[in-house]
Curated annotation (Swiss-Prot):
InterPro entries: NagB/RpiA_transferase-like (IPR037171), Ribose5P_isomerase_typA_subgr (IPR020672), Ribose5P_isomerase_type_A (IPR004788). It comes from Janthinobacterium sp. (strain Marseille). This is Ribose-5-phosphate isomerase A. The keyword Ribosomal protein does not apply. GO terms for biological process: D-ribose metabolic process; pentose-phosphate shunt, non-oxidative branch. Homodimer. Keywords: Isomerase.
Length: 223
């Protein structure tokens, strides 16, 4: 199977975790987009969705799925999203799509986090994929120096010569070269830096289930 076919396979498999009649959380990115397309086929079975980004909300609406504001609900049964990297313990790097803060917020409300990804995202140790950190724009340089002191190589994420701006009006610093031995500790350490909105480490609230696409089909891991 191609990488896209693997993503489609895990997106279809994730439908089994959708609880009928409830509101579900939906992530952001290419694999999440495949899931949204599958969700559109069963939209009459669910009450609606909470989106982790404006892009996700737009795609959900295009399928006729009702969007709910997270402030209007107390909890949700499941949050389904992709990952840039995931370990055998369920810790993840996320944020390649610049939606890490809202993804982390929505995931925190869900009873279950189902990660969907192609099998190449399963790693022994996090850190080969650059670690995204969302920052307040005026703190960009300050935070970058702090991240460099941790042993990483911080780079402001740019597109077309301009800093990428998140849905929250913030910037993204991608940190290369970090040796992430203890994801939960590093998550707390980076989140404590003044000016950081959040870091794209999902370790303290990692995945509960991972559906990983392989050439032989979908592998399921529980954490």
């Amino acid at each position: 199977m191609t990488q896209d076919e693997m993503k489609q396979a895990v997106a279809r498999a994730a439908i089994d975790y959708v609880v009928a009649g409830e509101i579900i959380g939906v992530g952001t990115g290419s694999t999440a987009n495949f899931f949204i397309d599958e969700l559109g086929k069963i939209k009459d079975r669910i009450k609606g969705a909470v989106a982790s980004s404006e892009a996700t909300a737009e795609r959900l609406r295009a399928h006729g799925i009702t969007i709910f504001d997270l402030n209007d609900i107390d909890s949700m049964s499941v949050y389904i999203d992709g990952a840039d990297e995931i370990t055998a313990q369920g810790a993840m790097i996320k944020g390649g799509g610049a939606a890490l803060t809202r993804e982390k917020i929505v995931a925190s409300v869900a009873k279950k986090f189902v990660c969907i990804a192609d099998g190449s995202k399963l790693v022994d140790k996090l850190g080969k994929f650059p670690l995204p950190v969302e920052v307040i724009p005026m703190a960009q340089a300050v935070v970058a120096r702090k991240l460099a002191a941790l042993g990483g190589e911080p780079r402001l994420r740019v597109k077309d010569g301009k800093a990428v701006v998140t849905d929250n009006g913030c910037y993204i610093i991608d940190v290369l070269g970090l040796q992430i031995e203890d994801p939960a500790t590093l998550e707390a350490q980076i989140n404590d830096i003044v000016g950081v909105v959040t870091v794209g480490l999902f370790a303290r609230r990692g995945a509960d289930i991972a559906l990983l696409g392989t050439a032989d089909g979908v592998n399921s891991l529980s954490f």
